[in-house]
């Protein structure tokens, strides 16, 4: 049951991991998972929520691993950025098939494939009810897609960054390794840093903290969780300035 008649957020930045798209597969994109995510995003659009999306690329390529094997880190990160573009194109296609207008913007120019990232264009598209998928990370090596999510969230003045994960939120310990780990409902930025909780990498997290961008971590694999988060229901873990 929905507690609020209208959404708690007007504009969100949804961060999806590349791994989330692979479903039970070990690699690539599971079409069923992609279509389910597109349907969940469609629900938000129909509620009048403006949706920006950042997708990782870990299902297709991980630059850090090859860097350890000797590949130049910059080259590896460039390849990772291209992986996020591939995921973005797949998501746009799934949204179009669900009759949702969507646009892919890339932080690196890819003429004929997708649009270049432009802040003013992105704001206009969001206001017109289109989903904007921000791909290629920040366009710079050494920055994660979590950093890109926080950066784009701040730029588009989103109400919140929603980090979709495979667990129900932020726990006292790894819930997979420790079944007794407890879920936090709310945390402050300071508590996350003091407790050394792994929400996202430090560069991304401090960017959000410095700009007072709230972060909510939730389980995208739980049907309806995204809608419940946006409707302001108790779901996942909220991180902001005053827990």
From Swiss-Prot:
It comes from Vibrio campbellii (strain ATCC BAA-1116). This is Uridylate kinase. Catalyzes the reversible phosphorylation of UMP to UDP. Allosterically activated by GTP. Inhibited by UTP. Pfam families: AA_kinase. Pathway: Pyrimidine metabolism; CTP biosynthesis via de novo pathway; UDP from UMP (UMPK route): step 1/1. It is an enzyme of class 2 (transferase). Belongs to the UMP kinase family. The lineage of its organism: Bacteria, Pseudomonadati, Pseudomonadota, Gammaproteobacteria, Vibrionales. The gene is pyrH.
């Amino acid at each position: 049951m929905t507690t609020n008649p209208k959404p708690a957020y007007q504009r969100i930045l949804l961060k999806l991991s590349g791994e989330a798209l692979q479903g039970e597969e070990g690699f690539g994109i599971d079409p069923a998972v992609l279509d389910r995510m597109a349907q969940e995003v469609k629900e938000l659009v129909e509620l009048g929520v403006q949706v920006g999306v950042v997708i990782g690329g870990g299902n297709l390529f991980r630059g850090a691993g090859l860097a350890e094997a000797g590949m130049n880190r910059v080259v590896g990160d460039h390849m990772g950025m291209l992986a996020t573009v591939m995921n973005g194109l797949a998501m746009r296609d799934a949204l179009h098939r669900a009759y949702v207008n969507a646009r892919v913007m890339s932080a690196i120019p890819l003429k004929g494939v997708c649009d270049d990232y432009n802040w003013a264009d992105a704001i206009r598209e969001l206001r017109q009810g289109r989903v904007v998928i921000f791909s290629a990370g920040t366009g710079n090596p050494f920055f994660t897609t979590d950093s890109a999510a926080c950066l784009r969230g701040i730029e588009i003045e989103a109400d919140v960054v929603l980090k979709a994960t495979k667990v129900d939120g932020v726990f006292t310990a790894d819930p997979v390794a420790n079944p007794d780990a407890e879920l936090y409902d709310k945390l402050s930025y300071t508590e996350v840093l003091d407790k050394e909780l792994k929400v996202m990498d430090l560069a991304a997290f401090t960017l959000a903290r410095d700009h007072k961008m709230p972060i909510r971590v939730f389980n995208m694999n739980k049907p309806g969780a995204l809608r419940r988060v946006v409707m302001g229901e108790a779901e996942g873990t909220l991180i902001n300035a005053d827990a």
